[in-house]
Swiss-Prot record:
GO terms for cellular component: chromocenter; chromosome, telomeric region; chromosome, telomeric repeat region; heterochromatin; nuclear replication fork; nucleus. Changing S1075A: Probable loss of Cdk1-mediated regulation leads to lack of dissociation from chromatin and block of replication resulting in anaphase chromosome bridging during mid-blastula transition in embryos; in the eye imaginal disk, results in complete lethality with pupae developing into headless nearly adult flies. Belongs to the RIF1 family. Highly divergent. InterPro entries: ARM-type_fold, Rif1_N. Residues 928-945 have a biased composition (Low complexity). Expressed in nurse cells and follicle cells in the adult female (at protein level). Detected in adult at extremely low levels. Changing T1043A: Probable loss of Cdk1-mediated regulation leads to lack of dissociation from chromatin and block of replication resulting in anaphase chromosome bridging during mid-blastula transition in embryos; in the eye imaginal disk, results in complete lethality with pupae developing into headless nearly adult flies. Interacts with Pp1-87b. Interacts with SuUR (via SNF2-like region). This is Telomere-associated protein RIF1.
Length: 1416
């Protein structure tokens, strides 16, 4: 059987209501509370359904019987009645109440009776007053809006609540106001400007001076905004703008701070409201956060985020958003605030991109820049969130119409460049692609093209603070703009013929190349790629018919030259090809200098070290150039073309490039010339290419007598000091234009030696000396700047001795070439095998190349100037990136870089610089340098800046080399036998010395050392990873050890004329002809450096034949004597190998002294510091565990040692007096410093609390005097202090003010109307007040109205108000008549007496005057 629970609940309620009526009728007050609670629960369960009561009965019972109990004197009955009625209003509909018969009578009681009682309850601070007001207003509902009498009665109650000084009453008044807003919104009254202005009055004017009141006020105001909904834009000026100013400051009154700056609770509520107003798109996390905070949700997207509304009101919205960003970033944000920061920045970004309001975009970028430049470095979070949003969503920016687009692009560009240090490069690049998208910046007409040109000029403006990273981002913008320019010029080609546009675009094309060349040595990566080169080529081709094209091509040639010399650019060949292509289209022979520019640039390319790929591309461009030219053009340029082709072949051979490209290249050029009718140029070209296979064999027997040369020949000889020794007959005319190569008259080659002398052009390992008559003129200008220094001769010698010494040194150069070259090739093959398995990284990793070491310098004792003999050693280079040696270009004198050898070769410490003949004084030059620092520096720089091997041989004319140096790379590993055809006496001595030296060197461990080095690219980011393997010169290690090893010169026999040379050499045990070898040293610590290195020993090198022997002595620079046991404190850090272990060793020693001093000082000051810590930590309640030095920890990246103090001194000091403690504190720290420390680390409340705990009265007096003095000088401070006192102690503050001032002073500051109303109201309930007021009426009549008519009218008004009876009227008339008679009698008597006295006695006049003066 189904049970109807609703009917049962209704019947239960009926029973309870009938019982309640009986209790109320019987007046059993002790049961009222239980009865009302039971009634409320029954009403809730039944919903007042199926109760068998009519609607009228229910309304009459609840509003007639229960509602009056809310005003009962018993507070408990009040509370129960309020709760029960609130439950009944849920079940009882308002329409039912208003349709009841008894409603008009109940409504009259509400207005006339209950409002007065509610006011009394409010004055009595009864918290139920606002609950009852709320219930009555909800019951009144729509009737409240129909008559102004009703609403005014209820509004007066709340208005006085807003003015109440008690914060609780004011907060309750705001709760009442929320109910009123709800009723207005329910009946669509908020659309009325009058109604809205009424609701905003307390919100805009009432002050919120407490956290509780401000929170409730903010909630009520936000509820009003949520009720406005889509009407929000119409009421922005009156409602929204004031709300933003109320929360975050600013606004029409330009408030410095808002509610969110003062109260944490208000901040938690204000920031979500701000984000909701900025809602460009709906956000579920924001909705969830609003529900958690019990805030009403605003419709999403926000009604304010439309283009029309935003254009009008973006300024106050942006000001509020910036203030909110600062609040969210100034402290460590909670999880909710981090979410709000992300949402606020995202909405800002969406508004910038979608709404396309140009002034807002510019202002927003400017404000974000200001936040980014803040001192607290909190702006990084904002810009990271901004660019993350752009990059993650690939936002598309709506184009701003008109000229404002230029301002927007400029603002974005500044923001991007300012943010590069905070935002990762990848994110910033994607953001640039979105912001400067081609379809958003491209030009569709001349005005837009002009605007785009203006932005291009802005982009090219140089900034002093700009670095290479900023240029990289600018270059990305350059690409976007270039694409837009290309698209426009493709459809409007005539624009390029306008002079201004052509000049701008020419500058635009040169800018990236010029800027990149200016950053040489400071850039860590290459910025150009294939897409850039394609764009650049398109723009170059677009301006083919532009005016001033020749000037542009000339400037482009100079720019390409600077770029080539500044740093190795992998894609230089692409740029060069575009330049040559443009030059061909313009006309290579129209202007004479143009083809010379091309060939001059090619000569520069061949002279500069470059990769094989770049060289092949440039040679291919040269071939294409030749193929494109016609016969008449080739005839014009042929004289300049020949040396260029020769230089290209020499460069190819010098770099020892592999592959068949060169042969194919030759065939292509020859095919072009073979097709021409004129065969003269083809024949010359054939001879030129055949000259490449010319090999010259120079015998070791070679004589020169400088004394037979004329002065002119000596000058020419000096000028050609760097040309290889290919000339026998030096007595021939040196003034002729050409020098004929020499061929020996007779060369006897034994059959056993034919293998050594068979040299072919196809041998890749051979060194080719290619000197022809046509190449001589090309080489000479390059070599002319090499200056050979003039050195002092140690003594006069005969010509024979000079020749013997020169021959002996030439022989010493060839000690160990065979085995060393074999090891070099082996090392190269191993490196090539390592580099081969990585083909995927071909654009980044280059193939192994060879690098020449520091040139080895030979010297002779000839009277003429010296020539250098360079013996190149193959070097294997492992390229790590496309940018090699980024630091070298900026250094005037490059030093050998640290090397790292990956393959497991036994480690050997060996440093062998070349032999340089000098005087017997310590050398001040670098190892491997000649007397000319500029030339040597240039040679070293050329060797280290580019991974290429120079194949040029430079021979000394006075010191002829043998055949081993002609082709030493393919020499056999066996010991060479003396050649039989050398018959001179000097040559026989050389052969004898060579045999003996080779016998001695075959057993030496240094003979098999390889001269190859692995020059590794060391970038700053990877320097610490490989810091353990560093090459350190031995002389620098000697400085580290702090020891002194002096050496004495070798005493040569007096019978021998010996040359003694002195030079600092790290390891003289290696071959003198070999450059500095690789060494590997692991520095464990400073004390582990051994002192028995071979570099610290002397070596005597001499040949066994006395006439040609030379004694050499190697002296280290003298240092002051130090003890090896004492650690060296003053180290030159630039001479110390900066390994991780070395830094740790230095840090440990420095830290050791500091720790010892700190411990010694701490032991003396333990008690003082313990007491100080106890006094400082007393407010936090923590025990003093550390002394003052614990906070001053040693600033070290390693293990920091905290010096802790034992607890015994702390306990001992706790019993000392306060005076003693204060004295010890002053001994530890200066009072000023202590005060600064307290101000910096302690809040003001803690310091003041200490003073008040010690002496409350004295501290309070001093604080009051200080505030009083400050208030006199600062009006704002005075206002704040007085407001605080009046808010927290309103009654006492007012009582004291009244007591301290006269009543007249107090009354002068009151409104007379208010005082009069108060006195009249008081007289109604106080008899004494009423009597006093009536007693003042006669005086007012005397001194008030001047005319009798006014007085009479006032008296008549009084009589009418009194409504006297007949008897009272008669008595009043009798009194008036009697008063009239008395007045007439007194007047006549006074007049008669006066007249008689005046006539009878003349002296009465003086007496009367005296009486009058006394009265006065």
């Amino acid at each position: 059987m189904d049970v109807d629970f609703g009917a049962q609940a209704g019947q239960s309620y009926r029973t309870v209501q009938l019982s309640a009526k009986e209790v109320l009728a019987a007046g059993r007050r002790q049961h009222y509370c239980n009865m009302i609670d039971l009634l409320a629960s029954s009403c809730k369960s039944s919903g007042l359904i199926a109760t068998s009561f009519t609607d009228d009965e229910l309304v009459e019972f609840w509003l007639g019987d229960i509602l009056p109990l809310m005003f009962d004197a018993d507070r408990k009955i009040q509370d129960c009645a309020v709760a029960a009625l609130a439950e009944a209003l849920v079940a009882l509909d308002v329409s039912v109440i208003h349709s009841a018969k008894c409603w008009p009578q109940i409504r009259s009681e509400f207005v006339d009776k209950y409002t007065i009682i509610i006011g009394e309850m409010r004055d009595a601070k009864n918290s139920n007053w606002h609950k009852i007001w709320t219930l009555l207003v909800q019951i009144m509902d729509e009737d409240l809006l129909r008559g102004c009498v009703y609403i005014n009665k209820f509004l007066a109650l709340v208005e006085l609540g807003f003015r109440n000084p008690d914060n609780g009453v004011r907060s309750e008044a705001f709760l009442c106001w929320r109910v009123l807003i709800k009723i207005f919104a329910a009946y669509d009254e908020l659309t009325s400007a009058k109604r809205l202005r009424l609701l905003l009055i307390p919100l805009r004017t009432s002050q919120s001076r407490s956290s509780h009141v401000s929170g409730i006020k903010l909630r009520v105001w936000w509820y009003l905004l949520s009720c406005l909904d889509h009407e929000l834009p119409k009421s922005f000026d009156s409602a929204v703008e004031h709300f933003l100013a109320f929360m975050l400051g600013g606004g029409p009154r330009n408030l410095a701070t808002g509610l969110a700056h003062n109260y944490q609770t208000a901040r938690e509520l204000a920031l979500p409201c701000l984000v909701a107003l900025w809602g460009v798109e709906s956000s579920e996390p924001l909705q969830r956060l609003m529900r958690e905070l019990r805030l009403e949700t605003l419709v999403q997207p926000s009604p304010l985020m439309s283009v029309e509304v935003f254009q009008q009101h973006w300024k106050p919205l942006l000001a509020a958003a910036v203030s909110g960003l600062k609040l969210l970033t100034e402290n460590d944000a909670t999880e909710a605030e981090q979410l709000l920061l992300q949402l606020l920045v995202r909405n800002l970004c969406l508004a910038m991109f979608r709404l396309a309001v140009a002034p807002f975009n510019v202002a927003c970028c400017s404000e974000i820049e200001k936040i980014l430049q803040a001192e607290d470095n909190s702006g990084g979070r904002v810009v990271r969130a901004l660019f993350n949003t752009i990059a993650a969503d690939n936002l598309v920016m709506e184009r701003v119409s008109g000229s404002d687009h230029l301002d927007v692009l400029e603002a974005y560009l500044k923001l991007v460049l300012k943010s590069k240090t905070e935002v990762p490069a990848a994110i910033l690049q994607r953001s640039i692609a979105c912001i400067f998208a081609v379809d958003r910046i491209e030009a569709n007409n001349q005005n837009e093209f002009r605007m785009l040109g203006s932005f291009a000029e802005l982009l090219m403006q140089a900034n002093d603070e700009e670095d290479f990273e900023g240029f990289a981002f600018k270059l990305q913008v350059w690409r976007q703009v270039s694409q837009a320019l290309s698209n426009y010029l493709r459809n409007n080609a005539l624009e390029y013929r306008v002079a201004h546009n052509a000049s701008l675009l020419d500058t635009w094309l040169l800018w990236p190349l010029q800027t990149l060349a200016a950053f040489a040595g400071r850039r860590a990566s290459n910025s150009f790629d294939a897409s850039f080169c394609d764009q650049w080529r398109q723009l170059v081709n677009a301006g083919q018919n532009a005016p001033g094209r020749k000037k542009f091509l000339t400037d482009l040639k100079a720019t390409l030259t600077d770029l080539l010399k500044s740093k190795d650019e992998p894609l230089f060949a692409e740029l060069f090809d575009a330049y040559v292509t443009s030059l061909i289209k313009f006309g290579l022979c129209k202007e004479a200098p143009l083809y010379k520019d091309v060939f001059g640039l090619l000569q520069t390319i061949f002279e500069q070290p470059s990769s094989q790929k770049t060289l092949e591309a440039c040679l291919n461009t040269l071939r294409n150039l030749v193929v494109e030219l016609r016969q008449n053009e080739l005839m014009v340029v042929f004289d300049s073309l020949k040396p260029t082709l020769s230089s290209g072949i020499q460069c190819w051979n010098k770099m020892k490039c592999e592959g068949g490209f060169l042969e194919e290249w030759k065939r292509g050029i020859q095919e072009k010339f073979r097709k021409l009718p004129m065969k003269t140029m083809a024949n010359q070209l054939k001879e030129l290419f055949k000259a490449d296979d010319l090999f010259v064999i120079i015998p070791s027997v070679w004589s020169l007598n400088p004394e037979k040369l004329t002065d002119r020949q000596k000058e020419r000889f000096a000028e050609k000091s760097d040309i290889p020794a290919l000339y026998n007959d030096m007595s021939q005319s040196q003034d002729s234009a050409s020098i004929k190569p020499w061929t020996p008259k007779k060369v006897v080659i034994a059959k056993s030696k034919q293998g050594e002398l068979a040299l072919t052009g196809k041998d890749d390992n051979g060194e080719v000396i290619d000197i022809t008559a046509s190449e001589e003129s090309e080489k000479e200008p390059v070599r002319v700047d090499v200056v050979t220094p003039i050195r002092k001769k140690p003594g006069r010698k005969s010509q024979a001795q000079k020749e013997l010494e020169a021959a002996a040194r030439a022989a010493s150069l060839a000690e160990e070439p065979p085995k060393r070259q074999t090891r070099t090739r082996a090392a190269q093959k191993e490196t090539e095998q390592v580099a081969q398995p990585q083909p995927a990284f071909e654009p980044q990793l280059r193939s192994p190349k060879k690098l020449p070491p520091s040139p080895v310098v030979q010297s002779t004792a000839a009277a003429v100037k010296q020539a250098k003999v360079a013996k190149p050693t193959p070097v294997v280079v492992i390229a790590q990136s496309e940018d090699l040696f980024p630091e070298v270009a900026a250094e005037p004198e490059p030093q050998p870089e640290p090397v790292k050898k990956p393959d497991p070769v036994p480690e050997t410490t060996q440093l062998t610089p070349p032999d340089v003949p000098l005087e017997a004084v310590p050398s001040t030059q670098l190892p491997g340098s000649s007397g000319d620092p500029a030339a040597s520096a240039g040679a070293v720089a050329a060797g280290e800046m580019s991974p290429k091997k120079s194949g040029t041989r430079i021979y000394n004319l006075s010191s002829p080399p043998d055949r081993k140096q002609t082709n030493n790379s393919s020499s056999p590993t066996l010991r060479p036998k003396p050649t039989g055809h050398l018959t001179g006496r000097g040559a026989q001595l050389i052969n004898m010395i060579r045999n003996k030296k080779l016998d001695a060197a075959s057993g030496s461990p240094y003979a098999c050392m390889s001269t190859s080095r692995l020059v590794h690219q060391v970038t700053p980011a990877r320097a610490q990873d490989r810091a353990e393997q560093v090459s350190t010169p031995t002389s620098e290690l000697n400085e580290l050890t702090g020891t002194d090893h002096t050496s004495t010169p070798i005493q040569a026999p007096p019978s021998k004329d010996l040359l003694v040379f002195s030079k600092r050499l790290p390891s003289p045990s290696a071959s003198p002809s070999v450059s500095i070898l690789k060494r590997k040293l692991r520095c464990e610590s400073l004390d582990d450096v051994t002192l028995d290195s071979p570099a610290l020993k002397r070596k005597r090198v001499s040949f066994h034949d006395p006439p040609v022997s030379v004694t050499k002595e190697y002296l280290r620079d003298a240092e002051e004597t130090r003890s090896s046991l004492k650690p060296k404190r003053c180290l030159l850090m630039d001479k110390v190998a900066q390994t991780t272990e070395m830094r740790q060793a230095l840090r440990r020693r420095g830290r050791l002294d500091s720790i010892i001093e700190i411990e010694r000082f701490a032991s003396e000051q333990t008690a003082r510091t313990a007491t100080t810590d106890k006094s400082l930590d007393k407010s936090t309640g923590e025990a003093p565990e550390e002394d003052a030095f614990t906070s001053l920890k040693w600033n070290d990246t390693g293990n920091a040692h905290n010096i802790s103090i034992s607890e015994e001194p702390v306990k001992a000091m706790e019993v000392e007096s306060e005076l003693e403690t204060a004295g010890q504190d002053l001994a530890i720290m200066d009072p000023e410093a202590a005060l600064d420390l307290a101000v910096a680390q302690l809040p003001l409340e803690s310091v003041l609390q200490r003073y008040f705990d010690k002496s409350p009265l004295k501290s309070a007096g001093m604080l009051a005097k200080f505030l009083s003095a400050q208030m006199t000088a600062n009006e704002k401070l005075k206002t704040n202090v007085l407001e605080t006192l009046s808010e927290n102690h309103s009654k006492d503050f007012l009582d004291h003010a009244v007591r301290e001032n006269l009543s007249s002073v107090v009354c002068d500051r009151l409104n007379p109307t208010s005082v009069l109303e108060y006195v009249c109201a008081k007289s109604k309930i106080s008899a004494s007040c009423r009597n006093g007021l009536l007693a003042q009426v006669p005086e007012i009549l005397k001194s008030g109205p001047r005319s009798d008519s006014e007085r009479l009218a006032f008296v008549q008004q009084l009589m009418v108000q009194c409504s006297p009876g007949d008897d009272l009227l008669l008595d009043l008339i009798d009194l008036l008549m009697r008063t009239r008679r008395e007045r007439n009698n007194s007047t006549s008597t006074h007049i008669s007496k006066g007249v008689v006295s005046a006539v009878g006695s003349p002296d009465n006049v003086a007496e009367t005057a005296a009486d009058s003066s006394s009265n006065l």
